[in-house]
């Protein structure tokens, strides 16, 4: 029931055309997620993780609510179609932009307001982590596309250097932090923050390639990270632990699992032939046109991400095989295979033939850039 409620709120966020309704459903997502983590979390820290998620999101939403009230008092409407035709003064844009940014930055999340995410992932049940990584994080990116870029183009251009700096810090910092993690879920959680740093880099590049790349990267990240959390859930069901030091040599007892894990690891790195490569490549092309120095720093972070991803695969799947009880050594079940296979094929399909998405994105992204003059 909670998952259906959560999915319903998420669908409404992406479909409403009214700013007030957008805010209501944007924040309503928090309620079922709070309950899922607080009740069905995996350890005694679940209450703290749920409250952190609640407080971080609530703090950002206060600023967004004040900004919405300010817009409604001036425009007399909350309809996106009408608001897109209005022009706000530069000074008002700068203030309103910051208010909305405070909420979207927490949700996506950006460094330094990302601390709730690793704890939420660690404590959430597997299905909760999949929805959190696959869809919930994308609400922030959607907010940038739906609100900040079209309604406040001058402010978006003004704050682009700030976004670029925060994005580069996120990519480098999370890549280094991930190398120190000992929990499987924390590794994927911190890598998600780094990938979202690349998303914000592309969204504020101000060109077609960057924005299209960010959207593709969000889609790819949703599939890849969701699949990785499902695979972590599979080994947790067998071994009842996510501590990396406990594992080793699983390739010998779970060869099919190892194949899927290796494929999604390559996708997480952004190897050519995967959907993540298409998104990252377009993001870097777009960002390179805006700020070469920051883009080079972010490329360094991508190299570091390859390091921790391959280290994780080597530590868990390869190495000296450890002795496990017989009931822990069985390979993927038929159910697990059938929900991982579509994810793997999607990553391959979008990596080989990305035009299926790019062709759809050309018109709306071009319209966004033309109308906002960003």
Placement of each model-derived feature along the sequence:
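Predominantly late transmembrane helices and immediately cytosolic-facing juxtamembrane segments
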Residues: 225-228, 289, 293-331
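Hydrophobic residues within the alpha-helical transmembrane core of Major Facilitator Superfamily
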Residues: 8, 59, 144, 263-266, ...
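Hydrophobic alpha-helical transmembrane segments of multi-pass membrane proteins
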Residues: 55, 98-105, 132, 162-166, ...
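Acidic, glycine-rich loop-and-beta core segments that form the ion-binding/anion-interacting portion
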Residues: 118-120, 124-128, 136-222
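Juxtamembrane/interfacial segments at transmembrane-helix boundaries in multi-pass membrane proteins
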Residues: 46-48, 62-119, 144-162, 210, ...
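Hydrophobic/aromatic positions within or immediately flanking transmembrane alpha-helices
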Residues: 23-24, 54-55, 131, 164, ...
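Final/C-terminal transmembrane alpha-helix of multipass membrane proteins
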Residues: 193, 336-356
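Alpha-helical multi-pass transmembrane bundles of energy-transducing inner-membrane proteins
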Residues: 5-92, 177-190, 194-242
């Amino acid at each position: 029931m909670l998952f259906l409620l959560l999915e319903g709120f998420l669908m409404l966020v992406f479909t409403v055309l009214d700013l007030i309704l957008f805010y209501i459903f944007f924040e309503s997502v928090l309620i079922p997620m709070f309950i899922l983590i607080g009740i069905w979390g995996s350890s005694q820290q679940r209450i703290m993780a749920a409250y952190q998620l609640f407080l971080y999101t609530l703090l950002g939403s206060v600023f967004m609510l004040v900004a919405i009230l300010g817009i409604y008092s001036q425009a007399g409407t909350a309809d996106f179609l009408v608001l897109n035709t209005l022009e706000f003064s530069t000074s008002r844009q700068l203030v309103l932009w910051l208010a909305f940014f405070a909420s979207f930055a927490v949700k996506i999340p950006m460094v330094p307001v990302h601390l709730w995410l690793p704890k939420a992932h660690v404590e959430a049940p597997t299905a909760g982590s999949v929805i959190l990584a696959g869809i919930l994080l994308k609400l922030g990116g959607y907010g940038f596309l739906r609100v900040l870029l079209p309604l406040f183009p001058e402010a978006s251009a003004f704050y682009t250097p700030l976004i670029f700096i925060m994005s580069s810090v996120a990519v480098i910092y999370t890549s280094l932090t991930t190398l120190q993690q000992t929990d499987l879920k924390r590794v994927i959680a911190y890598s998600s923050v780094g990938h979202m740093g690349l998303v914000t880099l592309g969204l504020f590049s101000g060109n077609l390639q960057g924005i299209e790349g960010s959207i593709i990267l969000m889609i790819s990240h949703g599939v890849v990270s969701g699949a990785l959390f499902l695979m972590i859930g599979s080994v947790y069901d067998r071994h009842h632990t996510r501590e990396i030091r406990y594992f080793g040599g699983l390739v010998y007892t779970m060869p099919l699992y190892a194949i899927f894990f290796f494929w999604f690891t390559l996708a997480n790195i952004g190897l050519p032939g995967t959907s993540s490569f298409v998104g990252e490549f377009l993001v870097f092309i777009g960002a390179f046109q805006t700020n070469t120095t920051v883009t080079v720093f972010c490329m360094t972070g991508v190299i570091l991400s390859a390091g921790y991803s391959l280290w994780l695969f080597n530590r868990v799947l390869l190495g000296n095989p450890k002795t496990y009880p017989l009931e822990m050594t069985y390979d993927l079940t038929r159910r697990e295979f059938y929900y991982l296979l579509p994810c793997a094929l999607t990553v391959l399909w979008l990596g080989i033939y990305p035009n299926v998405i790019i062709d759809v994105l050309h018109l709306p992204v071009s319209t966004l850039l033309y109308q906002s003059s960003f």
